[in-house]
Amino acid sequence: MATGGAAADLEDVQTVDLMSELLRRLKCSQKPDKRLIFIGPPGSGKGTQSPVVKDEYCLCHLSTGDMLRAAVASKTPLGVKAKEAMEKGELVSDDLVVGIIDEAMNKPKCQKGFILDGFPRTVTQAEKLDEMLKRRGTEIDKVLNFAIDDAILEERITGRWIHPSSGRSYHTKFAPPKTPGVDDITGEPLIQRKDDNADVLKSRLAAFHSQTQPVIDYYAKKAVLTNIQAEKAPQEVTSEVKKALS
């Protein structure tokens, strides 16, 4: 991490947060840089593992949806262009998304690297991402593919139930409420998200596989892909992820 750049970045940190930011940088200074991509279908556990890896290696988590919303809200030049596209009902171009990722990488919390989640979804996007990273003199270090059988995913997702006001979640098989269909704390009814039914899930998985397999093949040819057996218990998956990144 360049010292001059790091010092300049501190100008953007509010005084009240300055000490915690300096302590974070001290802790992170000995960590190796890592630029990672997490690939996996809905329910594969990426969201569970991302915070663990982020904290362990002092990385930032880059979700394309979050970055687009932040760029639009802060009215950056790229954010303005993205907003124009969205207001016209158009897809935000690959170049624009890569540009927003490029901007996000300049943030102090991304100086040791990042976890990219939700991008790239196509080989063209992967190529554009590689081109941008090459201009920065860097590259993707590792792509983790959270591989899991569709039948296991269906069991995981279709059994999920939520208590709307608190966000508490249950599972009919793995973490059932004391009384079926009722929140343990309030006694209020539980609901199931619209996306958590078998038909919607099968459609999403079919789209994921057809769209993402070429991306998996792309990174496999570059010898940076590791398959993670995501059907295991979360702690076992964490161990496998750490082993892959060591």
UniProtKB/Swiss-Prot annotation:
Belongs to the adenylate kinase family. It comes from Arabidopsis thaliana. GO terms for cellular component: cytosol; mitochondrion; plant-type vacuole; plastid. It is found in: Cytoplasm. Catalyzes the reversible transfer of the terminal phosphate group between ATP and AMP. Plays an important role in cellular energy homeostasis and in adenine nucleotide metabolism. This is Adenylate kinase 4. ATP binds at residues 43-48, 160. Residues 63-92 are annotated as: NMP. PANTHER family: NUCLEOTIDE KINASE. Keywords: Acetylation, ATP-binding, Cytoplasm, Kinase, Nucleotide-binding, Transferase. Residues 159-196 are annotated as: LID. InterPro entries: Adenyl_kin_sub (IPR006259), Adenylat/UMP-CMP_kin (IPR000850), Adenylat_kinase_CS (IPR033690), Adenylate_kinase_lid-dom (IPR007862), P-loop_NTPase (IPR027417).
